[in-house]
Amino acid sequence: MPDNTPPVSQQGLPLGMAFRWVLAITLLLGSVLSAIIPPGKSPDEADHMVRAYLLSQGHVFLKTERCQGENALCHNGSTMSGGPVDQGLLEYFRLHDPYRRHKESMLDLQAGRVIPWRGQEVFFHAPGTGYYFPLVYLPQATALALGKTLGLTVENSYYLARAFAMTSGVLVLTLAFYIFWPQPAVLALLLVPMSLFQTASASIDFLCNALAILVIACFLRVATLRKEAPNSLFWMMALAVFLLGTARAHLASMVLLMAAAAWPTRRIQPWAAAATATVAILAWMALAIPATIDFRIPREMGTGQVVAYYLGAPLQLVRVLAHTVTDGNMLNSYVASFLGVFFDQPLTHRTYAWLAGLVALVILPCLASPRRLLQAALARSALVLTGVAGTLLAFLAMLFTWTPHPATLVQGVQGRYLLVPAMLLLLAVCSWEPAVHPWRQRLRWALLYVLGGVSMVVSVHRLLYAYYVQPAVALPSAVQAEPGALEPSPPLGPGSTIMLQLPPATSEPTAPATYGIGFLVGTYGQTLQGTAQLTLTDRAGQHHGVEVSLDDVTDNTYVFAKVPPGHYSQVELRIIQGQAAFSVWTFRPAAGNAARPTEAPVPMACTMTIREDRSMQLMPGCPGPK
């Protein structure tokens, strides 16, 4: 039977083709999800953005501050590790705190999009990122620095960071697929909902996954070329392995691939590259681990003491690991967070079953024959060893640094940590060459398209349902048509003020607090640009000021503003700046109306309040929002 293995010069995609395919697919999938996924929903995304901001300001290491007392943020006179962060960035992520579990609303969108860089910094704790070599945050740091320099809002800077993070991953994947052709097993794991979700976030996951695939591509290329492999491949591997090992500690095991790749060459430089990566990773850990102060998980023993304990009690270590990997609830959580959990929003059990089945269908046609397995026994053994070591390190890292001691189960391991080890183990049993028969090649790609399509559909459906579909809200019976007429207020421009009356139900003594206010505007067919100020007076007579963006407001729509929760008796609207005059719609009841028997009814501004119980109140006689 003829050997259909491509010559070594053709074992990667042409550079232009690789870039076009990776860019098109990533932009199509990632950009759609990026437009849907609310800010801050990726695990620890706020901390990652804080670390990126610190890098943009020249802070390589995290710092601590002196403090007094003993509490969650102060221990032995020191805070947890962190650094000085712009108040605007912190304000933005407080607004989008994922633990609020609120649906996204127009109030959140309008409040978030106007937050500027404040220019004032306060100390913020982000100890979970202190172990990572900061170079991996360079794309996000560049975006934040650029956004701040250009005067963009925090939100625009944040989405620029998402775009830069996605672009950096695209470039690394392009290089990987140029070095060695895309492996269907690897692509399948990149297309599960969890991977797509992280691709669209501003975290470091997509770049780390791309770097891991680059290391794998270099390894497979070297395994094919053997002694003819150029030294540049090994130094490229060394850089990627260093970035991986210092950003994802369990992936430091990929130095084993470098050693296995260097063995057949019988040259000094490949071994020098492997040694350099190993020493650099250990050196960074020796610097970062002692310098990072993290007491989020209260423990009486430090990381070093926990390591020493298990070194002296290896049987206890085996028992903890065995108990963890045989616990049914833990296994279910690993599968769910491997295939797809959007922060705290899992998919259905049926969806997980379908996704697992599709991944298996993609992999089955790629399995290598026994002859192929034996032809590259050393390389395949290295893949197995590295995958197993990476999995073990993921559990050990969380046991030593995160799990309360003494432990019965390892806590903190997420299924997405095992993505790269799974790739390595699958590649150990899959064929690395293109399919011999064209129909099999077409079958592989067809299955990948189906998997990608299904992943996108279930991801979009779950994201919309979890974060946007509101529960049914019934308007009060007072919102009914009544005799009268809508009238525009006098045109308002910069410096103009108008008093806004609130719906009568807002003033009820037992009414829930108001946290959102809207007012209906008429723009005379124009699209507004500008800023307004709401001054709210509560029942105690205290005043609260809220800035409102008028940008992109169109004719006959409500402008919403998020306000501090409270009970308000008076609201004044003042126009600060703007390019076009507009009016606030008012409702004047008909004279002689039984509800308002006065001869000259006073027009009431068309306002709307949103209360903390998520109910809405509308000024009687006014139209509701579109």
Predicted features, each with a name:
Residues 1-31, 74, 272-277, 375, ...:
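Start-transfer (signal-anchor) and selected internal transmembrane alpha helices
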Residues 26, 183-200, 206-223, 233-244, ...:
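Membrane-embedded helix bundles of polyisoprenyl
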Residues 471-626:
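C-terminal luminal/periplasmic domains and tails of membrane-associated envelope-modifying transferases
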Residues 182, 227-230, 266-272, 364-389:
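Membrane-interface helix-loop-helix junctions at transmembrane boundaries of multi-pass membrane enzymes
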Residues 59-160:
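Interfacial juxtamembrane loops and adjacent helix segments
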Residues 159-182:
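Transmembrane-helix motifs of polytopic, lipid-linked glycan transferases
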Residues 288-371:
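Membrane-lumen/periplasm interface segments of multi-pass, membrane-embedded glycan/lipid transferases
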Residues 5, 218-228, 252-281:
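Perimembrane helix-loop-helix junctions
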